[in-house]
Structures are given as C-alpha cells and as structure tokens.
C-alpha cells in the first residue's frame, strides 16, 4: 500500500522532549547530530533532524558527527570534521524496519495460534521476527536431519609406545591390507560403513583379540614425516564473535554481553560494540604493537601487522572492530576495572 511508504508518529508521552529540542535548536547556529555510528543511529539522527527542520531552508546548519569511541581525540576529531547525514544508511535501516513488519505481522498470529501469545516464563508478548523465524526454520531442518541419523559402533585400537625414554601415541590404521574404519567411513543413513569392501570394521571381540596378540610385541618406527603448520590468530571482535566468546568463556547471554559492552563503551573503555567489521585503524594497530613491544619485547612483534580488510557482504564498512578505546591499550587492572 502506498509503495510501502512508512508513516512515522511520535511515541506517546515524548512530545515534550521534541518540543524542548525544537526550542533549543532555534537558539543555536548549528545542530550537530551525534547519534550512534550505525544504521539505527543514522536513522534516529535523521528523524530528529527532520523534526527540527532539517528539510527546510536552514537544513544546512544540521551536521552529522560520528565517532566510534568516547575518547578526547576521537570526539575532537569528529567535531572538527562534521559530515552529512548518510541517506543510504537511513534508507537501509528503513527497509529493514519495513521487512520486519511485513514478516512479523504475517507470522506472529500463526505463532500465537500454534504456540502461545506470551512467553510462559516472562509473560512478555511473543512475536515472529524477520531473522529469528528463518533461524528457527534452520534449527528445525537440522533437528529433522539429526532424527534421520542412524548411529553405528566401531572400536579403535590405541597404544602408547615408548622409545629413548619418551612416549608417543599410536593408532591401528590398517589390518590385513585394509584401512580400519573410523567415524568418517560411516553413512549417516544406514549406520554402516559406506564401502564395506574397502575397510575393516573392528568389533569388540576382534579388538580385544588384537590387544592380546600385540601386547608383548615390539614395534619399529619405519619413517618419520615432519610438517610445518601455521596457526593464525582469530580476527578482532565484531558483535557476533564477542557474544560467542563471552558465552564460551564467561557463560554470558548475548543480552548480558551487550549490556556490559554498552557500559564499557559509554565509559570510554572500548569502541562501538555493534559492528560487522574486523578492521582496525592504523592508530589501534600502532598502539597494540607498541604495547606488545613494551610488555613482551620486540622479538614477539611480527615483521608487519596483520590486516583483516575483507568484510562480509552488507557489513557496515566505516566501523572498526571492537577493541580497547584510545591509543594506549591499557589493561583492565590499569583502568581499575
């Protein structure tokens, strides 16, 4: 209807806030919009500016300032280099809100009918969202796949061998010219090896018989193969990986993680915590390398910094990854946290 053009109305009880902002805006030469540096922040800033006269003749006095951290340097730089409201970001946020409603208004009544209109624990109204509805579908498909799975059983033969005062683990991989079956050889549909002619399946009697035969045998290392490998560090935190790590290490929910991150951001300890980016500024990289050299020594510094420049499709490119704010990379102890 009407080309999906949304109609925005003032939240009940907030008229006085808008009236106050309008009154104050008339007393200044410039209005600086410093809402959060993401799509939602851009849209909020745009709607505030609209209410204050952004699209009238004096719209040029409305300037957008963006910063990813509450530090003196970041805020000062943003104030010295104001920009314009990014209408592409505003349109992107608006499209997402419209899609939320197109999906939610259609699916939520079905959710209420089939499950419940409210959460049985919190008693909050339930709704079906654009993202979580698809996620639930993926979970259902995965559960159906799990239920179709047919388990199988097999035995491994493991040993601890010793040589020159040292020990190392060993595993039986071949028997009578055939490869000993492992989990990767089984079909999830049958619970049996996919190619029973190519592998030998150890059952318990066979495995125990082999143990009895080999217990007193001597073994010879026929060859040694050495391989180099590199273990790359994980990329810097973005919102999703921060939530995952906080859950794995601290057992925090996504909501609790974001609540703590919001407080750290507002206190000037970390950069903005809602980001898809793994990019770090040159200032941050220099600060991190300086701290490593100071604390651990130059031998622990890589010859050149590792850059994570590629972004996921649709990522909010202007953002940095989540990192300690400022250019000193102080520890929690140094900050008194």
Model-predicted segments: where are they?
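Toprim catalytic domain recognition across nucleic-acid enzymes
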Residues: 1-337
């Amino acid at each position: 209807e009407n080309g999906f053009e949304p109609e925005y109305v003032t939240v009940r009880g907030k008229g006085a806030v808008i009236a106050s902002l309008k009154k104050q805006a008339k007393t200044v030469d410039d209005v600086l919009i410093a809402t959060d540096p993401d799509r939602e922040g851009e849209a909020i800033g745009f709607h505030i500016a609209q209410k204050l006269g952004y699209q009238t003749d004096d719209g040029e006095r409305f300037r957008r300032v963006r910063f990813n951290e509450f530090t003196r340097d970041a805020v000062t730089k943003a104030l010295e280099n104001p920009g314009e409201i990014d209408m592409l970001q505003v349109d992107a946020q608006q499209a997402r809100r419209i899609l939320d409603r197109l999906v939610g208004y259609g699916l939520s009544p079905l959710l209420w009918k089939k499950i419940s209109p409210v959460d049985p624990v919190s008693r909050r109204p339930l709704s079906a969202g654009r993202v979580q509805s698809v996620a639930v579908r993926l979970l259902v498909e995965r559960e159906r796949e799990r239920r179709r799975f047919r388990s199988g059983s097999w035995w491994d033969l493991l040993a601890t061998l010793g040589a020159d005062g040292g020990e190392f683990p060993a595993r039986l991989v071949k028997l009578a010219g055939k490869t000993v079956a492992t989990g990767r050889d089984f079909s999830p549909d049958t619970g049996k090896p996919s190619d029973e002619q190519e592998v030998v399946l150890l059952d318990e009697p066979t495995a125990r018989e082999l143990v009895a035969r080999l217990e007193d045998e001597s073994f010879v290392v026929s060859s040694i193969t050495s391989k180099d490998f590199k273990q790359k560090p994980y990329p810097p935190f973005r919102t999703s990986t921060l939530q995952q790590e906080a859950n794995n290490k601290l057992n925090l929910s996504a909501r609790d993680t974001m609540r703590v991150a919001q407080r750290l951001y507002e206190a000037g300890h970390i950069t903005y915590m809602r980001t898809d980016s793994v990019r770090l500024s040159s200032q941050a990289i220099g600060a991190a390398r300086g701290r490593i050299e100071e604390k651990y020594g130059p031998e622990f510094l890589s010859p050149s910094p590792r850059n994570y420049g590629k972004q996921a499709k649709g990522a909010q490119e202007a953002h940095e990854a989540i990192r300690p704010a400022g250019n000193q990379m102080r520890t929690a102890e140094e900050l008194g946290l």
